[in-house]
């Protein structure tokens, strides 16, 4: 039996099979026999078809195989899955172009032509030519631009990568010029052509992207200023947080070392909490250890013996949040447990619902007491119809109380079963996908428990006040008063469980029942004391007034209780975990999508914080990536699912859940702890901090206020004649920094004792640590990380970090140090690391006006004049039209005056557009399409050094003939009679030997001689 597809590939690995078969007139598929036989020993190997019988595999010769002998089972070949049609003669079906083979005689006209001179390549000969380009010709396109199918070199494999069009080489440019043009004129025109080509590409790129938000934030006169102010506000906020941590000693107590990862993470989290507006109370969340997931205790009813017998049934409690979703059968038989599928187990902590567990245990006892009371009252009092109705009302009210007060009337029981079933299904779906319900249960449980305790105390106090009426009631009235108090307590509890609308609905039936109970007690009293009807009426009126006063007092107490509970809940809130967030990653955002559009979609979800959009990449066709940040307690998967079902500007955003950072402290090279490297790092960090502070003008306001009092000479002396660090900086981490940059060494002692450095280089020296230097360096590294989002030990910057889900996410720290280090390793490390940080060390200087003029900068006044001329149209003699307004004038000067007076905003837009374009040109790191590979990668001969500086030689440079053969015949008139010097062979100078001439002594004197 074949172990893999290698058995199928073995046939394709037959090197010369395709070569031999292509020479035969018939096709391979026609020659392949369908039945088993001895003739197909090469095409039908036995091991290729292990599931066929012996007849198919061995041609009926006997045995072998899996099938044994009878009823051979046919297993389709791999070629059967390709469908009908001839099989390509080269390679696998999924490959677009054939592999490089030698030329087929039936493809062309018998020539070894490199590629078609005009048009596209229908036979994909270009693939052959590109593969053997280094062996046959350095000019793959015979003087023409590369075809569209040419794969870009230098490792760029993405065919969707946009590039500039190929610029003409000097040879191609010469083909477009006159034959009699001089060399100097050719060079001048070619230089102009390159300049115009660059201007055109910059202008086209600007026009293509000027309406996109990311481009406006960089260069637009208004949007760029607004974005810069926003970023500067972020930096100032970060600076304030860093100074606060520096003053309270948090920064000084931590080392940027991988061994102190927990302390570093705590510092970063502290910064995030402060940036989010947290207080010192919120910082206590960092001291709490992460809680383990609470154990799940699934309570089973004592009566459900069948659930104990089988393990496939899980009994859970009914949720209190969905009272209207209960069906009629559930209301009639409430004490039965709810049976759910074993695939989904509702995770509930122990303290999530203590009150419900107690109520469930009291349910059987309460029902038995209720039944005994009813059985005792019926023969004694012989209840009439009204009394039976009252008993039913009391029974329903007690039953609803034992059901966690899900309802106070029969509205939910009157709903149709179909609606309740559909609602319950929706509720189950919500529970199924609510992955963080278990996490929120812990937080809600404690708050609800405290709230219920306070409400019970207030209700008890109100009940005691109601139990003392002005006149002592009869024993029967005493029982009724207890029932009234129980109902009032129930109303108070219902108010705390449901919202305001439901509470109003439940209070009205309760108040009506209280009023209906009071006259029901009067007939009993009148039947016992028929002679004292007037006294009973007086007592009834007094009882009514007392009841109304008690109800009003209870309402006031209830309102006060709710107000007090809200204040207490605010005071008793836990520290907020502001450093923990949930986020969604958007993989594809079209360049036309704005940040405001994403915010509009996300603000519909609760817990939305911010959105960050990265700069576009040319490799992704200028598509961008985005991160949407929410609070930690949201259901991030449900939000992600909702975003995936939406399209923005006909673009699928590709939303996925962004995971938390795995390792926030990552180790760097341990050699960085060496004293010499630490001193070099301090110098580099100080330069970077100085450059970034100057770029964003963080300390410029303080410096300007102090330097305003100094003379120019004093100011120059204060800054040491240049912007060097440490002398007049208001940055606290840069003050007195020069004291640590002066290197000390005992050179004289080593010279006297004869201690040479060669021995140290051979054996190496141990790592020398200087704690004061390391402390200064750590303060600088943390300043760069917290304020400027620069990770020094990773020599990179984390852009737009204030809008990202993690505002201080990752930091690199010094790793474990090696035992010994050589001087060469130290010097090499310092040199290489300084090169990696050049992007931060070099100051960003905008291009001057002279430089941008060469790139095609525009003049505002000239562009305004062009705008006026474009909107001045002559209709007839002394009749001119302004297209902006449609008005007609007698002369162009009137239109000019009209445009400047009535369309001033249009003129301002033209000036802003000019400034917009010039700002783009001033940026030395401006985004633009990469150069075409054919333009950027040229050989020396293409750049104009061979053939007199203009024309390259026309023979293959990489496959030159062996030494001793004459060079190609390119002398004489050259192309078109031009007198170019004779071409030299493209060989290295050391291999070019002088030609030796042999002179015959008998020959005439004036014969040809080489020397």
Swiss-Prot record:
Modified residue annotations for Phosphotyrosine: 90
Protein name: Serrate RNA effector molecule homolog
Residue span of region Disordered: 1-113, 138-162, 284-558, 919-953
Species, as recorded: Drosophila grimshawi (Hawaiian fruit fly)
Similarity section: Belongs to the ARS2 family.
Gly residues bias locations: 56-71
GO cellular component: nuclear body; nucleoplasm
Statement: the UniProt record of this protein carries the keyword Protease: no
Main subcellular location: nucleus
Biased composition (Basic and acidic residues): 8-33, 41-50, 103-113, 284-309, 316-331, 375-384, 427-450, 512-543
Compartment(s): Nucleus
Name of the encoding gene: Ars2
Record note on quaternary structure: Interacts with cbp20, Dcr-2 and pasha.
Domain of life, source organism: Eukaryota
Compositionally biased residues, Acidic residues: 352-363
Keyword Nucleus set for record: yes
PANTHER family for this protein: ARSENITE-RESISTANCE PROTEIN 2 (PTHR13165), SERRATE RNA EFFECTOR MOLECULE HOMOLOG (PTHR13165:SF0)
In-chain residues carrying the UniProt-annotated modification Phosphoserine: 92, 322, 352, 472
GO BP terms in the entry: primary miRNA processing; regulatory ncRNA-mediated post-transcriptional gene silencing
Record's function text: Acts as a mediator between the cap-binding complex (CBC) and RNA-mediated gene silencing (RNAi). Involved in innate immunity via the short interfering RNAs (siRNAs) processing machinery by restricting the viral RNA production. Also involved microRNA (miRNA)-mediated silencing by contributing to the stability and delivery of primary miRNA transcripts to the primary miRNA processing complex containing drosha and pasha.
Biased composition (Low complexity): 81-95, 544-554
Keywords recorded for this protein, A-Z: Nucleus, Phosphoprotein, RNA-mediated gene silencing
């Amino acid at each position: 039996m074949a172990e893999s597809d290698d058995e199928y590939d073995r046939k394709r690995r037959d090197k010369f099979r395709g070569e031999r078969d292509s020479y035969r007139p018939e096709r391979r598929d026609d020659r392949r026999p369908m039945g088993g036989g001895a003739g197909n020993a090469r095409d039908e190997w036995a091991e290729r078809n292990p599931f066929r019988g012996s007849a198919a595999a061995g041609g009926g010769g006997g045995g072998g195989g899996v099938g044994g002998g009878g009823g051979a089972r046919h297993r389709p070949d791999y070629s059967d899955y390709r469908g009908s049609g001839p099989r390509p003669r080269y390679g696998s079906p999924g490959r677009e172009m054939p592999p490089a083979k030698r030329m087929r005689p039936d493809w062309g006209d018998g020539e070894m032509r490199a590629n078609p001179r005009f048009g596209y390549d229908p036979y994909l000969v270009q693939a052959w030519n590109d593969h053997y380009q280094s062996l046959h010709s350095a000019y793959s396109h015979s003087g023409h631009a590369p075809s569209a199918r040419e794969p870009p070199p230098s490792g760029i494999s993405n065919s969707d990568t946009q590039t500039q069009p190929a610029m003409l080489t000097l040879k191609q440019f010469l083909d477009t010029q006159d034959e009699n043009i001089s060399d100097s004129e050719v060079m001048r025109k070619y230089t102009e052509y390159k300049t115009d080509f660059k201007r055109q590409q910059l202008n086209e790129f600007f026009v293509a992207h000027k309406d996109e938000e990311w481009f406006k934030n960089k260069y637009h006169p208004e949007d760029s200023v607004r974005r810069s102010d926003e970023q500067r506000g972020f930096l100032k906020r970060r600076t304030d947080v860093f100074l606060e941590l520096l003053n309270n000693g948090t920064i000084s107590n931590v080392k940027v070392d991988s061994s102190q990862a927990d302390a570093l993470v705590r510092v970063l989290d502290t910064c995030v909490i402060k940036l989010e507006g947290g207080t010192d109370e919120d910082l206590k969340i960092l001291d709490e250890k992460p809680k383990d997931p609470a154990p799940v205790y699934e309570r089973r009813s004592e009566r459900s013996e069948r659930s104990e017998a089988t393990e496939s049934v899980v009994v859970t409690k009914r949720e209190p949040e969905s009272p209207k979703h209960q069906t009629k059968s559930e209301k009639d038989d409430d004490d039965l447990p709810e049976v759910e599928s074993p695939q989904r187990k509702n995770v509930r902590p122990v303290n999530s619902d203590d009150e419900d567990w107690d109520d469930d245990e009291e349910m059987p006892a309460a029902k038995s007491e209720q039944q005994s009371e009813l059985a005792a009252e019926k023969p004694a009092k012989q209840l009439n119809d009204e009394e039976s109705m009252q008993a039913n009302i009391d029974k329903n009210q007690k039953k609803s109380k034992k059901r966690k007060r899900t309802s106070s009337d029969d509205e939910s029981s009157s709903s149709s079963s179909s609606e309740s079933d559909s609602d319950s299904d929706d509720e189950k779906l919500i529970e199924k996908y609510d992955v963080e319900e278990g996490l929120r249960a812990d937080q809600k449980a404690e708050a609800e428990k405290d709230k219920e305790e306070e409400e019970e105390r207030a209700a008890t106090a109100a009940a005691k006040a109601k139990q003392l009426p002005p006149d002592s009631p009869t024993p029967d009235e005493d029982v009724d008063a207890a029932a009234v108090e129980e109902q009032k307590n129930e109303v108070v509890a219902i108010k705390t469980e449901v919202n305001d609308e439901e509470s109003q609905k439940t209070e009205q039936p309760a108040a009506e029942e209280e009023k209906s109970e009071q006259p029901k007690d009067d007939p009993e009293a009148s039947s016992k004391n028929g002679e004292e009807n007037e006294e009973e009426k007086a007592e009834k009126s007094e009882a009514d007034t007392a009841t109304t006063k008690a109800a009003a007092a209870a309402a006031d107490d209830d309102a006060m209780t709710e107000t007090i509970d809200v204040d207490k809940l605010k005071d008793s809130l836990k520290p907020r975990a502001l450093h923990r967030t949930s986020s969604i990653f958007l993989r594809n955002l079209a360049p036309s999508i704005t940040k405001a559009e994403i915010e509009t979609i996300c603000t519909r979800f609760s817990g939305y914080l911010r959105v960050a959009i990265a700069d576009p990449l040319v490799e992704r066709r200028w598509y961008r990536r985005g991160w949407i940040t929410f609070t930690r307690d949201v259901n991030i998967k449900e939000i992600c699912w909702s975003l995936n079902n939406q399209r923005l500007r006909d673009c699928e955003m590709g939303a996925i859940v962004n995971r938390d950072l795995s390792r926030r402290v990552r180790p760097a090279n341990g050699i960085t702890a060496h004293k010499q490297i630490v001193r070099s790092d301090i110098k580099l960090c100080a330069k970077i901090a100085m450059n970034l502070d100057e770029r964003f003008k963080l300390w410029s306001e303080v410096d300007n206020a102090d330097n305003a009092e100094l003379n120019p000479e004093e100011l120059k002396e204060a800054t040491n004649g240049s912007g060097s660090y440490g002398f007049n900086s208001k940055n606290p981490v840069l003050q007195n920094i020069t004291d640590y940059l002066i290197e000390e060494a005992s050179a004289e002692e080593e010279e006297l004792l004869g201690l040479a450095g060669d021995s140290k280089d051979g054996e190496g020296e141990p790592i020398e640590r200087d704690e004061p230097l390391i402390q200064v360096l750590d303060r600088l590294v943390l300043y760069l990380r917290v304020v400027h989002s620069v990770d020094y030990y990773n020599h990179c910057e984390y852009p737009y970090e204030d809008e990202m889900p993690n505002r201080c996410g990752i930091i690199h720290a010094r790793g474990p140090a090696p035992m010994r280090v050589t001087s060469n390793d130290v010097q090499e490390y310092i040199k290489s690391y300084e090169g990696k940080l050049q992007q931060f060390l070099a100051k960003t200087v905008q291009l001057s006006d002279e430089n941008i003029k060469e790139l095609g900068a525009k003049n505002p006044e000239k562009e305004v004049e062009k705008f006026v001329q474009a909107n001045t149209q002559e209709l007839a003699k002394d009749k001119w039209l302004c297209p902006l307004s449609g008005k007609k004038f007698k002369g162009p000067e009137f239109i000019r005056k009209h445009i400047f007076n009535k369309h001033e905003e249009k003129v301002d837009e033209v000036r802003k557009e000019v400034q917009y374009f010039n700002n783009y040109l001033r940026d030395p790191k401006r985004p633009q399409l990469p150069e075409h590979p054919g333009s950027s990668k040229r050989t020396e001969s293409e750049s104009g050094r061979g053939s007199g500086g203009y024309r390259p030689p026309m023979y293959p440079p990489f496959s030159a003939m062996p030494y001793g053969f004459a060079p190609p015949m390119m002398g004489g008139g050259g192309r078109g009679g031009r007198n170019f010097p004779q071409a030299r062979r493209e060989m290295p100078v050391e291999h070019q030997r002088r030609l030796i001439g042999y002179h015959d002594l008998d020959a005439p004197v004036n014969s040809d001689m080489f020397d």
